[in-house]
Every structure is written in C-alpha cells, then in structure tokens.
Regions:
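Generic N-terminal amphipathic, Lys/Arg-enriched alpha-helix
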Residues: 2-17, 26-28, 32-33
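A conserved mid-protein helix/loop that constitutes part of the nucleotide-sugar donor-binding site
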Residues: 20-21
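Acidic/glycine-enriched connector segments
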Residues: 24-31, 40-121, 127-131
Length: 132
C-alpha cells in the first residue's frame, strides 16, 4: 500500500460563505494533487472541505478522514469516507494535528490548540484569515 500525504483542514466549525468557498477550493486542489484530507468531522468547515474533495475528478472512497471528539460515529459529515470516533473530546486535536501538514481557516481556541500541536510536531502550517 502506498502512503498518501494527509493534510488537515482546521478552523471554526461555523465559517461564513467566503470561508466555505475557500475551503472547498483548497480541498478540491488537495485531492487533485493525490493527498487525503483530515478534519474534526463536525460543522460547516468539514462539510465544505468534503464537498470540495468529492468534486475533484480523481476523488476516491478513502480521501476524507473525520476524527470525531465523541464515541458516536453518527454525527460525522455525510461526505466522510473514514470515520474515527475517538471519545477524546478536545484531546483529539492532537490526532488531527499529527497530519503531514495543517491548513487553518478561521477558528478560535480549539484551532489555536491544533496549531500549537502541529507546531510541536514540526508540521507545515498555513493560515487563512477569514471570519469564523
């Protein structure tokens, strides 16, 4: 099996329409380059990411990974290919941040903690300033 580079798209669960469009475009480009997308799996941002991912012509059934805070897989975004219900609540931010690279779009304290973990793991971090 060939390893696929995993890029986490993180940020506030609820972003505005400009942020949604940005996330969709980023996600589509990530999949077109042959990478996977990791998110927290809940809210508007992951839904936009997965919509963008699925719009890529080369999208497969293993391109989107949702790392959920709870034990229940049901709340995951419907476009999720791989759902990992961790039961770790906010501590699952460590798992998300252990991706190969991080793209932050908006966000608050939770996003900041994911960025801090990514920094500790020496992962590349890209930040986009949008309301969220």
């Amino acid at each position: 099996m060939v390893y696929k580079f995993q890029i986490a798209i993180i940020g506030g669960r609820d972003i505005d329409s400009d942020g949604e469009k940005l996330v969709e475009d980023i996600a589509r480009m990530i999949i077109e380059e042959g990478y996977r997308i990791v998110t927290g799996g809940l809210g508007v941002l992951p839904k936009a990411a997965y919509r963008g991912a699925k719009s890529a012509e080369n999208s497969t059934d293993s391109d989107t990974i949702s790392i959920l805070p709870g034990f229940d897989p049901k709340p995951a975004i419907e476009y999720s290919d791989i759902i990992i219900p961790t039961g770790l609540d906010a501590y699952r931010n460590v798992l998300v941040s252990n991706s190969d690279a991080i793209i932050a779009v908006g966000g608050g304290a939770g996003t900041l903690s994911e960025i801090a973990y990514a920094w500790q793991f020496r992962r590349p971090i890209i930040a986009a300033l949008v309301d969220g």
